[in-house]
Amino acid sequence: MTITAQQALQRTIEHREIFFDEMLSLMRQIMAGEVSPVMTAAILTGLRVKKETIGEITAAATVMRELATKVVVPPPHDHFIDVVGTGGDGSHTFNISTATIFVTAAAGARVAKHGNRSVSSKSGSADALEALGANIMLTPEQVAECVQATGIGFMFAPSHHSAMKNVAPVRREMGVRTIFNILGPLTNPAGAPNTLLGVFHPDLVGILVRVMERLGANHVLVVHGLDGMDEVSLGAATMVGELKDGEVSEYEIHPEDYGLAMVGSRNLRVEDADESRRVLVGALENQPGPAREIVIFNAGVALYAANLVDSIEAGIVRARELVASGAARAKLDEYVQFTRKFGGA
C-alpha cells in the first residue's frame, strides 16, 4: 500500500499512525530521494511530535536493512552479537560499549559492532577505535574476515548505508533527534541476531525490544540507566527490556544486586577521544576504579545476551575473570593489529 508524502504528513499532524505497508513505501521514497527536503523534514518532525509507533519504527528499520550494504558472516550465529547504543544521552562518558566488545569477544562471542563518529558525545565508537589505532575503513569482506579471525568486526555506518546520503543534509540542518537516531542500532548490516542495545530514553526500552522481536531477533536486552545513560549504569537502576525464546519481559537491575558499588556517571566523563582511549585501555588493563567496574557490568550483560552464560550474574563473574587475566586487553591488541594489515594508520 503506497502513501504520498503529503498524506503521511497529514497523518502525523492528526496524530494518527502510518500503517506498516505505508511506512515501507514512504521510507523507500525518502531513501531514494523522491521526497523533497522540506517534506522530509516536515514528516520527520511530525513523527517525532506524535511519537513513532512500534509498527512505524519496524517498517523504517526493515527498509534500512533492505538497502544496507551487507556483511556476510558464516554461521554458527548462536553467540553472534552487536553491542550498540543510540547515543544522545548527554553523559559524555568514555566509550563503554566499545570497551565491552573486547571482553565479550574474549569470552568466545563473535561481535559485529555497528557504529559511527560522535554526534553529541565526546567520542563515538568510530572515534574510539581509531584512537586505539584500528583501521575502520574496511570493505564488507574485510569486516567479515575480522570477525572470523578475531571475533570482532566494526561496520562504519556511512560505509554501509549509502542511501542515507539523501537524508543526511536534512538531518544535519534540522539538528534535532528524529526516527533516524534510533534506526542505526536496529539495522546491523551483518544481521547479528543477539543485541545489547542502550537507549537514551526510558520509553524506548519497551518500544525497541518489541521492534527487535518483529524484526526476528533472537536474544536482545534493551537497556536504559535511570540516571539517563544509554548503557547499563552503575549510578542508578537500569531498565531492561528482554527478548528471549520469543518472549518479552521488562524489569530493572541494580548494581548492588551484583555486589557492585554505585558510582555516578560524572566519574566516567572524558573530554575527548584521546582521554576516552586512555580510560578504556585502563579498564581493560584491570586498573581498579569505576571505568573497570562499568565495563565488567556491561560485558556481563552482553555475555548473557550472547548466550554464553545463563544469567547476568554469571556473565559478570566471567567478565571479571577475562579482564583480570589480560584476555580482554589481548583481544583489543589482536583486533587492532588485524585491521591494520588492510592498511590504515
UniProtKB/Swiss-Prot annotation:
It comes from the Bacteria. Mg(2+) 1 binds at S97, E231. One of its GO terms (biological process) is L-tryptophan biosynthetic process. InterPro entries: Anthranilate_Pribosyl_Tfrase, Glycosyl_Trfase_fam3, Glycosyl_Trfase_fam3_N_dom, Glycosyl_Trfase_fam3_N_dom_sf, Nuc_phospho_transferase. HAMAP family: TrpD (MF_00211). GO terms for cellular component: cytosol. GO terms for molecular function: anthranilate phosphoribosyltransferase activity; magnesium ion binding. It catalyses: N-(5-phospho-beta-D-ribosyl)anthranilate + diphosphate = 5-phospho-alpha-D-ribose 1-diphosphate + anthranilate. It comes from Azoarcus sp. (strain BH72). Binds 2 magnesium ions per monomer. This is Anthranilate phosphoribosyltransferase. Anthranilate 2 binds at R171. Pathway: Amino-acid biosynthesis; L-tryptophan biosynthesis; L-tryptophan from chorismate: step 2/5. Mg(2+) 2 binds at D230, E231. Pfam families: Glycos_trans_3N, Glycos_transf_3. Homodimer. Its EC number is 2.4.2.18. Catalyzes the transfer of the phosphoribosyl group of 5-phosphorylribose-1-pyrophosphate (PRPP) to anthranilate to yield N-(5'-phosphoribosyl)-anthranilate (PRA). 5-phospho-alpha-D-ribose 1-diphosphate binds at residues 85, 88-89, 93, 95-98, 113-121, 125. Its cofactor is Mg(2+). Keywords: Amino-acid biosynthesis, Aromatic amino acid biosynthesis, Glycosyltransferase, Magnesium, Metal-binding, Transferase, Tryptophan biosynthesis. Belongs to the anthranilate phosphoribosyltransferase family. Anthranilate 1 binds at G85, N116.
